């Protein structure tokens, strides 16, 4: 499991980028769907991440790749726009997968996945989406939410 210190360090990095950023990331829609007794749960990565500058996030992730490599799989790829004549191409997307966060289910070894998706659409509207999605056994859903809220509260208490 990822050390708590590294989790806090990654969150502090994103929060620091948010405080010094000029570009904003708009809120994404709430999505939820079930699949084979697992849940794919997408929601905005709230708090500071609503105002994270896109380039700084990518830069920090690249700089910290060697540190988080044992815990994250980082993949950068391009997604061209379907309507290039109307919208600027979708230049970059960043996907971070954090595996083996939770214990395996009773059915056997089922690797859990936590992914951060960063999609930057350089259209006139600058639609930027930053969302966290995770697929875990159903019993871990509330555990993860409680842990995430506790992590956020801890961050606020450290800064105050």
Swiss-Prot record:
Completely overlaps YIL177C. The keyword Nuclease does not apply. It is found in: Membrane. The chain crosses the membrane at residues 39-59, 136-156. It comes from Saccharomyces cerevisiae (strain ATCC 204508 / S288c). Belongs to the UPF0479 family. GO terms for cellular component: membrane. The keyword DNA-binding does not apply. This is Putative UPF0479 protein YIL177W-A. It comes from the Eukaryota. It is a multi-pass membrane protein. Keywords: Membrane, Transmembrane, Transmembrane helix.
């Amino acid at each position: 499991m990822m050390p708590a210190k590294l989790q806090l360090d990654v969150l502090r990095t994103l929060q620091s980028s948010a405080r010094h950023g000029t570009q904003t990331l708009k809120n994404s829609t709430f999505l939820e769907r079930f699949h084979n007794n697992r849940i794919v749960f997408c929601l905005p990565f709230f708090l500071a991440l609503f105002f994270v500058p896109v380039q700084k996030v990518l830069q920090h992730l690249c700089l910290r790749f060697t540190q988080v490599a044992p815990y994250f799989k980082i993949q950068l790829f391009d997604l061209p726009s379907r309507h290039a004549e109307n919208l600027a191409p979708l230049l970059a997307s960043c996907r971070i997968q954090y595996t083996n966060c939770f214990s395996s289910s009773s059915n056997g070894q089922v690797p859990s996945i936590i992914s951060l998706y960063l999609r930057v659409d350089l259209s006139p509207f600058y639609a930027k989406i930053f969302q966290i999605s995770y697929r875990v056994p159903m019993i871990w859903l509330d555990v993860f939410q409680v842990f995430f809220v506790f992590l956020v509260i801890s961050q606020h208490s450290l800064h105050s």
